[in-house]
Amino acid sequence: MKEAKFIFVTGGVVSSLGKGLVASSVGALLQAHGFKIRIRKLDPYLNIDPGTMNPTQHGEVFVTEDGAETDLDLGHYERFTGIKATKDDNITTGKIYHELLKKERRGDYLGKTVQVIPHVTDLIKSFIFNGTEGLDFVICEIGGTVGDIESQPFLEAIRQVNYTLGKQRVILIHLTLIPYLAAAQELKTKPTQHSVRELNSAGLQPDIILCRSEKEIFDNQREKIAKLCNVSLSNVIPAPDVSHIYELPVLYSQCGLDTQILEHFHLSKPKPSLTEWDQIVHSIRHPTQEVTVSIVGKYTEFPDAYKSLVEALNHGAISNKVKVKINWVNSREKEEKPIGEKLQNSHAILVPGGFGDDGVEGKILAINYARTNNIPFFGICLGMQLAIIEFARNVVKLEDAHSEEFRNCKHPIVKLAGDQDDDLGGTMRLGAYKCNINANSKMMDAYSNTTISERHRHRYIINSDYKDDLEKNGLLCSGISEDGTCIEAVELESHPWFIGVQFHPEFQSKPFSPHPLFVSFVKAAIDKK
């Protein structure tokens, strides 16, 4: 039975350098070489998961097929490799300590003093090794920055893995920043030297250093890094900025990253097939035209809050051979005129999911603008719920129509799903659910299938008591959950393209397999133009 090899990706100097994209690109390249891989994320924060974290702090919450609320990097892993992530692919310090304390209360430690070493580190190692049978490579990204106090148990666990398995089964990639000082007109390697020494102090020596920089890194600078950080010159690899993330697998292959990884493990190096990635990059660089899609939300100053959504639009654009220009519109704007002015040049309008009543009326104004001006509209999760509320108010004439999530009202179009408790964490309808599609609908035109499976993340559902009134007035309930209890999709029959879905189709879209709804939505934007 083959034994998996482990690739650990750490980051230094600053956060948000793109460790997740490095891990994703390495995974894609190893797949292209014919290897079976899996990518995991180790997050040092104390939350159990990011489910209750503010998107402005953490970015979007990516939902896996099996219902785990995870870090947005798992979305990158799926999009680059096509491998569905699971709840076993994301661990946090909070989850580790939660499990640790449960074991201690059960008496699993037989009266021993419970400590970071070995008990916390053993649980981290258990996560790293779990379910790796039959894999060639397991890629583990460590969140945060080397030197953070929260990262220390994870680095110690990696040190122990490295000690136990040896270099024949472990490689460490360190992503670092080489800042450019405009005043001195030169790149500075000193922060990288200090970052590597911090890593050394944890008992770890990087095998490969990836140098992120906005300027070209020359050989003399690479030689300096190699000499002072004790890494071979061929393993000091530039990681220049790119205009689009899907350029990265081809770029890293050209820089020799996959070659150096395989040489480290003394593996043969058949030439990888990157034709699919070349085609994707070509489509991005050579669009036939540009369309403008307005995204109306309350986190528009923080695009990472809508990471999968933006990527799904890009996938729809790639499929249609166009470029999507995103017009970010803050839904906290409650006046009709300013909203209209901000949307007037839109070829399509999208209202994404969200929580809380802040910005709700602004979204409803945007939905009304799309409906009454025949502009293609896509409502996702809360976006669908608000589209139905807008329709109920202005077409069905239920003036007090609203959602139980926000206030008591005479016509609760949206209600709480089933039995819920007061805790916010882990109480939602999460993960993949099947849905039956109306055969005579735009949904059917997009999917070409009457049964679909999509991922959900919501606590409230559409009140089915209003289904007949909605359909009688022209809003078709075109998607119903498999058990018949939830309205999953609606569409306006008299509109060129007006669809709302309760689920999150963006979580399943990939550059080489774009989601059919986003392909259809971008096509509608092209037709509108």
Swiss-Prot record:
Catalysed reactions, as listed in the record: UTP + L-glutamine + ATP + H2O = CTP + L-glutamate + ADP + phosphate + 2 H(+); L-glutamine + H2O = L-glutamate + NH4(+); UTP + NH4(+) + ATP = CTP + ADP + phosphate + 2 H(+)
Activity modulation comment: Allosterically activated by GTP, when glutamine is the substrate; GTP has no effect on the reaction when ammonia is the substrate. The allosteric effector GTP functions by stabilizing the protein conformation that binds the tetrahedral intermediate(s) formed during glutamine hydrolysis. Inhibited by the product CTP, via allosteric rather than competitive inhibition.
Presence of the UniProt keyword ATP-binding in the record: yes
Binding of ATP, residues: 16-21, 73
EC number from the UniProt entry: 6.3.4.2
Ligand binding (L-glutamine): 354, 382-385, 405, 459
Top-level division of the source organism's lineage: Bacteria
Residues annotated to bind UTP: 15, 188-193, 224
HAMAP family, sorted: PyrG (MF_01227)
Further details from the record: CTPSs have evolved a hybrid strategy for distinguishing between UTP and CTP. The overlapping regions of the product feedback inhibitory and substrate sites recognize a common feature in both compounds, the triphosphate moiety. To differentiate isosteric substrate and product pyrimidine rings, an additional pocket far from the expected kinase/ligase catalytic site, specifically recognizes the cytosine and ribose portions of the product inhibitor.
Role played: Catalyzes the ATP-dependent amination of UTP to CTP with either L-glutamine or ammonia as the source of nitrogen. Regulates intracellular CTP levels through interactions with the four ribonucleotide triphosphates.
Protein name (record): CTP synthase
Annotated source species: Wolbachia pipientis wMel
